[in-house]
A protein has these predicted regions:
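Charged helix-capping and loop-helix junction motifs
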Residues: 12-17, 44-45, 71-73, 245
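A glycine-rich helix N-cap at a beta->alpha junction
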Residues: 20-34
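C-terminal cap of metal-dependent C-N hydrolases
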Residues: 242-245, 266, 299-352
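Metal-associated gating/positioning segment near the N- to mid-region
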Residues: 1-24
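Short acidic, glycine/proline-enriched helix-loop-strand junctions
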Residues: 27, 78-83, 160-162, 240-254
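Histidine/acidic residue-rich metal-binding segments in metalloenzymes
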Residues: 42-227
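His/Asp/Glu-enriched, well-ordered alpha-helical/loop segment
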Residues: 108-136, 196-200, 217-227, 232-307
């Protein structure tokens, strides 16, 4: 994604990332370009130049372009060059300091809530812009029941829209957020207010049981096309603060496969092949690359997954520098045993 320092909003930065990735060789990196310069939402980035440098998509990652006319122009360029538009859907004007789902849990903690409409309003707008421009729209990390409904109806109308769901959004609800009871710091002689575990703070936030059920059914019915990680690592220091102050985001990469298998395959919503399709073939198809399936002559980017092992997630074993997960200590089934990139083993589980 382009939300780096510097922001990926021109071909020079795209080329730098691609060259760096080739040097490291641990994964095939496809760099997405920013929609606007500096992700400031005021002026379009050099989309044409970045397309020539090889970007498969544009995104304002982590925010929405609130200027609808500017976003329309970006979509027109995306349609012209046949690249995808990856949309984070959030009406920032409605967030109003919210840090978790707007429900009884937020009220009990005295925290600002984020309503479903924050997401749903922008989803509706972006679908309409996709309809008007012909751009290929992909909705990132959908979390609401109405997102599933809108995607379903858009597809029925022939609009070029696809959508993804993240494991935390189909596994947890706002009721699962670990609450921290109010205490008194006897050394500092101050009262510590009730709060919540910041490892449950992500954007979009965890929603309700009704939303979770709709997302699962949307994946089952192929309304929702992709299972994505929304991997957002943060340091312990970043997260070791209040729910109001902590950054949004959790690590998602190392728990995505096991949570998907446990919740959706063993839960009866997906077959193993559907899981593989939504985590590999469909994403590749959406961004227009010839990957995601195993055939003679294809590039061997392969994950070897063991569906039989049951274990407890231990954040201290993560390869990511981030340990900010709400799933530490959770019992799951299914484990990644090996990863190959271009036919070369880049990861191997040494335990077996």
């Amino acid at each position: 994604m382009p939300n780096t320092k510097p922001v990926v909003d021109n071909p020079d930065v795209v080329n730098y990332v691609h060259n760096k990735a080739k040097t490291v060789g641990a994964a095939n990196v496809l760099q997405v370009g920013a929609v606007t310069k500096g992700q400031q939402g005021k002026e379009l980035s050099n989309i044409e130049g970045m397309v020539k440098a090889g970007i498969p998509a544009i995104s304002e990652d982590g925010k929405s372009v609130m200027n609808a006319q500017l976003y329309r122009e970006a979509m027109e360029l995306a349609a012209k060059y046949n690249i995808a538009v990856l949309a984070h859907c959030e009406d920032i004007n409605l967030v109003n300091g919210g840090v978790m789902n707007a429900d009884v849990n937020a009220r009990e903690l005295g925290l600002g809530g984020i309503t479903n409409s924050v997401e749903d309003i922008i989803i509706a707008r972006d679908i309409m812009l996709s309809r008007d421009t012909g751009a290929r729209l992909h909705l990132c990390h959908c979390s609401t029941k109405d997102s599933v409904s809108m995607v379903k109806h858009a597809k029925m109308e022939g609009i070029h829209v696809t959508a993804e769901v993240c494991p935390h959004h189909f596994t947890l609800t706002s009721d699962d957020i670990r609450k921290i009871e109010p205490t008194v710091d006897t050394e500092k002689k101050v009262a510590i207010e009730a709060d919540a575990d910041t490892n449950y703070k992500m954007n979009p936030p965890l929603r309700t049981k009704e939303d979770v059920q709709a997302l699962k059914e949307g994946l089952r019915d192929d309304v929702m096309d992709v299972i994505a990680t929304d991997h957002a690592p943060h340091t312990f220091e970043d997260k070791n603060t209040s729910m109001k102050s902590a950054p949004f985001g959790i690590v998602g990469l190392e728990t995505a496969a096991c949570l998907t298998y446990t919740e959706l395959v063993l839960g009866g919503y997906l077959t193993p092949m559907q899981m593989a399709e939504k985590m590999s073939y469909n994403p590749a198809k959406i961004i227009g690359i010839d990957k995601g399936d195993i055939e003679p002559g294809k590039v061997a980017d392969i994950v070897i997954f063991d569906p039989d092992e049951t274990y407890v997630i231990d954040k201290n074993t993560f390869f990511s520098k981030g340990r900010n997960t709400p799933f530490d200590g959770r019992k799951v089934t299914g484990k990644v045993r090996m990863t190959l990139v271009n036919g070369q083993v880049v990861y191997e589980d040494k335990e077996k």
